[in-house]
Amino acid sequence: MKIYNTMSRKKEELKTITPGEVKIYACGPTVYNYIHIGNARPLCVFDTFRRYLEYRGYKVRFVQNFTDIDDKIIKKAIEEGSDYKTVSEKYIKEYWTDTKGMNVREATVHPRATENIDEIIDIISTLVEKGYAYPVSNGDVYFSPSKFKEYGKLSHQPLEDLEAGARINVEELKKEPMDFALWKGAKPGEPYWESPWGNGRPGWHIECSAMVRRFLGKTIDIHCGGQDLIFPHHENEIAQSECCNGVPFAHYWMHNGYINVDNVKMSKSLGNFFTVRDVAEKYGYEPIRYLMISSQYRSPINYSVDIIEQCKASLQRLYTCRDSLDFALQNAEDALPDNAEETKKSLLSHKERFIEAMDDDLNTADGLSAVFELVRDINSNVIPTSSKELLIFAKELFSELTGVLGLVYEEKDNDLDGKVEELIAARTAARKAKDFAKADSIRDEIAAMGIVLEDTPNGVKWHKK
């Protein structure tokens, strides 16, 4: 398997520290609001990556944090007349609702910044002792990128170029423009923790370094996140961690592309900002997941009403295939057609193409294409045979590949199924009695439920619109 490494700017063969095992850290959300569709992309992409690694036989330890103390959280707490704990707990709960809806599995561990203060203080203390960081009079502690000769190696920007665009705010006491806060001295009314430098709270970048070291170790296999995190967040993580621990921080860096809305980059200031909840209420959660993995993960994705509708339609093709297989199995026969082995080989060729695509830097776009080729093959060459063995073989293969992508996870609604089957039986009886007005009336009733009927030689098939 090859993955594109942002550090080297090329695809590299995946070689893990411990053969057969993968240690991955993904930057999680700052929990002060509902997650937006930009947040959804890394969640769905790296969940799919994890699923695929497990599918290929790796044991995956996947850690994703919650930033539960931050300027934005404090501001939100003031706006709502509450406290940072209430705000973070509220939006972590909402996060679980949205991720469950998108079929994003829980990480192995979901550490919170506030539960790792001791580890954070320990790393900062080491950096101060080694001369990479320094405390100032107001209780802040700053890191000096100029002391780390490899600073800029991830974003491929020399420190002098970065310094040219940096500014110092009047209230900051740092020595150089690029210095960044590891610890922030307490301000009146803000939450704080005790430290050797006085009461305060951690900076954003140090939180991830601490949680990586505690839950995965000093060196990990893969660190991932959005392209917007390459600089300064991931660059600063590398500097802190490598200066503290004296070993490489991560062997591979994976970054997903941006989300555009109607071909314009999504931003609150432009008013083209959508939460996952907003979109899910109109279109459901699964089309969001489908959209997020419909393009190669490093390329940008465009969100629009037309595109999300296309995603719904594509998903419906997958659900129709699943339901058609189930329907065909109800009347399946034990007899095997003469070309059964040839048909199985054809079906397996789509699996081979799927693996080839996913092995090539998680190319989910080509992976999906292979799944739809499988669907066409099933519809043309499996379902018409009514062969029980072939139908089961096809269904298991279909479920295997869609499961890796985290798709087709909605269970059948048994109550709805029963009601629809009851109406179909009544319609069939009306047609036999030549009461076509009643049959048409029942068909209209079924259509009003969002169900499409298809009359076939083997009976009536149906699916949701």
Task: Give each language-model segment a name.
Residues 66-70, 92-95, 105-120, 138-147:
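Short, glycine/charge-rich beta-strand/loop segments that flank catalytic centers
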Residues 78-84, 108-114, 198, 226:
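The substrate-binding groove and active-site-proximal loops of carbohydrate-active enzymes
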Residues 58, 132, 451:
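Short phosphate-binding/catalytic loops that engage adenosine nucleotides
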Residues 8-13, 17-105, 455-462:
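N-terminal, positively charged nucleic-acid-binding surface of large information/translation enzymes
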Residues 265, 273-465:
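Structural preference for alpha-helix termini/caps and helix-kink/transition segments
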Residues 1-32, 47, 97, 118-326:
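Alpha-helical recognition segments enriched in aromatics with Gly/Pro capping
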